[in-house]
């Protein structure tokens, strides 16, 4: 068993862990609720550093705005960072906020919904905390796109920079959190207000 520290993300490499089934990995996560675990496509386990209270507040703000929009529109379902999704490449990822269309949700069985469902959200958001390296987050966003995400926001509140990811084009970089990010056409009518994410 070996450990690799990549931009403050700890990767646990072990042949035994790489052989875990989807069900066994889910059970591992349930047995360790105080640790946020993800799984790479090669089945190596990723330990995510815990976020501080301010980072958690900002992630909660994003999730809250998305939840309020979805409550009004009722076009799908909203998830926060404790939810994991088993992507087509076999990785299991947990965005800070995610939205799944109603059509995609209805294709899942009840048993799948209770675990890490084999589905890729249409929209994801990652919020960078001071302990997060930017490079692994950008790689994570590329993984989302490669697996079917239609729109992704990578938010860096410390530098007031947002990166918008869409399939087939380079990420768009936006500076300044005195604005809203438009999620059309994936999320009709949703605009993420960045001002509550500013420092202080």
Model-found features: residue ranges?
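Gly/Pro/Ser/Thr-rich low-complexity, intrinsically disordered segments predominantly at protein N-termini
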Residues: 1-200
